[in-house]
């Protein structure tokens, strides 16, 4: 909703809810949305300490997502999952956000190998938004 109407209250609620979800179960999808919202908030606020906190928490969250998903990829059952391509997409975005471009590209290529046009479009749109808010 925030991206549609720029109402910061929607962004604050998203951060609160995604943050709770992330802290409860460390699901990569929830965590990626939490980190993204934190970066959006950092762009909106003038107060220096809060801006630093939001960006730090986003980076910390993405590093934990990377750790969790790298462990998952090494699990013998990984290829049986139905969301492998989205895990690759998430890893690509997380690595991109912490300036590990080679790893980001590696996982982007893995995502692109078997993705449909709408999935690629979704990935590219998310990547574009991420680049805009972290630069």
Where are these predicted regions, by residue range?
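Residue at a conserved register position within TPR or TPR-like alpha-solenoid repeats
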Residues: 1-2, 38, 45, 95, ...
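Short coil/turn linker motifs that delimit alpha-helical repeat modules in TPR/alpha-solenoid proteins
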Residues: 3, 7-10, 23, 79-80
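Structural motif corresponding to the intra-repeat A-B loop/turn of tetratricopeptide repeats
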Residues: 4-8, 41, 98
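Helix-turn-helix repeat elements of alpha-solenoid scaffolds
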Residues: 5-16, 53-71
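TPR/TPR-like (Sel1-like) alpha-helical repeat modules
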Residues: 19-27, 35-40, 53-64, 101-119
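Boundary/linker segments of alpha-helical solenoid repeat arrays
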Residues: 22, 27-30, 73-81, 113-129
């Amino acid at each position: 909703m925030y991206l549609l109407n720029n109402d910061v209250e929607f962004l604050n609620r998203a951060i609160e809810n995604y943050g709770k979800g992330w802290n409860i179960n460390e699901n990569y999808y929830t965590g990626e949305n939490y980190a993204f919202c934190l970066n959006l908030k950092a762009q909106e606020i003038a107060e220096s300490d809060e801006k630093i906190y939001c960006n730090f928490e986003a980076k910390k969250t993405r590093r934990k997502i990377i750790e969790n998903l790298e462990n998952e990829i090494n699990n013998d059952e990984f290829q049986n999952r139905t969301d492998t391509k989205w895990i690759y997409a998430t890893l690509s975005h997380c690595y991109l956000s912490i300036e590990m471009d080679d790893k980001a590209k590696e996982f982007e290529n893995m995502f692109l190998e078997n993705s449909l046009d709408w999935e690629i479009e979704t990935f590219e749109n998310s990547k574009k938004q991420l680049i805009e808010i972290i630069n």
